[in-house]
Amino acid sequence: MLANAIGSMASILNQFLGYAGFYLLNAAFEGASALANMLLAEPIVTESQASREKHPLRALPEQFRQLMRDSLHVLRTCPMAVKLIASSALISVPSYLTKMFLQQRLVELGWPTELLFLPLLLGGLACVAGTEIGRRVRCRSMRRLYTACALLCGVGTLLVGTAPAWGGILGMMLVQGVLEVYLLHESQKLNDAIPSDQRATLISVDGMAYSLLMIPASPLVGAVGDAFGQAGAGLALLGGVIVLSGVALLRKKPQES
């Protein structure tokens, strides 16, 4: 997160590197990352993992089907995992959209494009701060934590969509920081709720749920902004939805602590 924040400052080097330079530099970093990933190995946690054999390519389709059956079984028998996955997907929708549409709003408000790295830098620093705060937060109830984080994320999204330039930047920082607090505890609870053998797959499902929500959310937010002639209009609507999701939990009787 800190590297991404600092990397956002690379926009000021645009006049020296150009698009080709940035792509080549990115390719070099990705290549180094791929080499590092090749050194990773799965830790052996359970006996079934220790006795696992390598399968030929022709067996992969059946292995995939079995993996899907096992994952669906875990989701059916663990409602908590489903709730956690759904909550993280919904509350994470503003994460990318606030950063992207804030840049459009800043340009509309007269900001020079050379300074658009600044909100991305501050957003990355807010993520770092949110992670540090999150590990100090004692979560006794995911329901209450979601309610608090949804209200704060919703307010932050509303600020990005409606406030002046610095108010929008502060709103985006609020969204990024609060999300790190919630997602830190959500991932811990999800890890505890699912078996080790299905953990990697279901964590991927966690990310996939967010991607599926972004498919309609991103064009919808943009379409609302185009309809009203303001980039922030769609964000204001999105912020209201996130706030309502938190308010809705306030009216529900707690079922878990």
What are these regions (language model features)?
Residues 27, 144-159, 239:
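Structural signature of the two symmetry-related core transmembrane helices
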Residues 43-86:
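Juxtamembrane intracellular "pre-TM" segments in multi-pass secondary transporters
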Residues 1-15, 23-38, 42, 87-104, ...:
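Substrate-agnostic recognition of the 12-TM MFS/MFS-like secondary transporter fold
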Residues 19, 23-29, 33-56, 250-257:
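Helix-loop junctions on the cytosolic side of multi-pass membrane transporters
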Residues 80-85, 146, 168-169:
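Hydrophobic alpha-helix/TM-entry signal in multi-pass membrane transporters
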